[in-house]
């Protein structure tokens, strides 16, 4: 592996790790769904002017906005409001096993005994670490984070089927579709958006 590739890998891991801390700080200032809606609004405003609309794929992008934008990120922001950032990061590691299982169920991809054993170890490991006594995390919020990872696994399969839409275009239009969904749910279920 080239040094530049290694550096990019370390930087992406660093930014992913700091994301959990940044979100934790954010949900202490704003209601979780409202904060996520604002985040998607900013993403849409910044990206939409620079990408074309995937016209023949709009319905698929909308479905991804429901599973990834609203379900995954919405549940993630609600969950992390009652869970330690470190525990959230550990639970998030189940995203890969969930994706493998959903790819097997919906895309008919196969995996062998070693991968099945790895999936089992991942689930047992997360249960063991996340359930460690002394954590200040709410079990309900842990379950909500787990549900967000489940939604991410479903979205990963949907995205894999959408090969002809690039990542930036998908992100822009998913944000545009997700923001109103989250504003609406926030208006119904949350309070204190503007204080």
PLM-predicted stretches and their roles:
Residues 1-34, 134-161, 180-184:
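Glycine-/small-residue-enriched transmembrane alpha-helix faces in small-molecule transporters
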Residues 14-15, 19-20, 48-92, 100, ...:
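Specific transmembrane alpha-helical segments of multi-pass solute transporters/efflux pumps
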Residues 21-29, 80-81, 85, 127-140, ...:
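Membrane-interface helix termini and inter-helical loops of multi-pass transporters
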Residues 29, 55, 82, 108-110, ...:
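Helix-loop interface residues and adjacent transmembrane-helix termini in multi-pass membrane transporters
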Residues 41, 47, 64, 101-106, ...:
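Hydrophobic transmembrane alpha-helices of multi-pass small-molecule transport proteins
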Residues 43-47, 99-100, 105, 137-194:
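Transmembrane alpha-helical segments that form core, pore/gating elements
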Residues 57-67, 111-123, 141-142, 165-176:
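Cytoplasmic-side transmembrane-helix entry/capping segments in multi-pass membrane proteins
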């Amino acid at each position: 592996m080239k040094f530049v590739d290694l550096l990019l890998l370390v930087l992406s891991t660093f930014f992913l790790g700091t994301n959990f801390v940044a979100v934790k700080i954010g949900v202490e200032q704003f209601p979780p769904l409202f904060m996520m809606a604002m985040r998607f609004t900013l993403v849409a405003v910044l990206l939409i002017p620079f990408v074309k609309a995937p016209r023949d794929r709009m319905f698929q992008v909308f479905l991804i906005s429901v599973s990834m934008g609203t379900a995954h990120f919405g549940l993630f922001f609600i969950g992390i409001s009652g869970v330690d950032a470190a525990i959230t990061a550990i639970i998030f590691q189940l995203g890969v096993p969930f994706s493998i299982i959903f790819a097997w169920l919906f895309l008919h991809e196969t995996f062998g005994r070693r991968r099945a054993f790895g999936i089992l170890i991942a689930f047992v490991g997360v249960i063991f670490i996340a359930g460690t006594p002394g954590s200040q995390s709410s079990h309900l919020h842990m379950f909500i984070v787990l549900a967000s990872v489940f939604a991410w696994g479903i979205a990963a399969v949907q995205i894999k089927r959408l090969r002809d839409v690039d990542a930036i275009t998908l992100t822009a239009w998913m944000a545009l579709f997700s923001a109103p969904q989250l504003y609406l749910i926030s208006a119904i279920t949350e309070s204190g958006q503007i204080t």
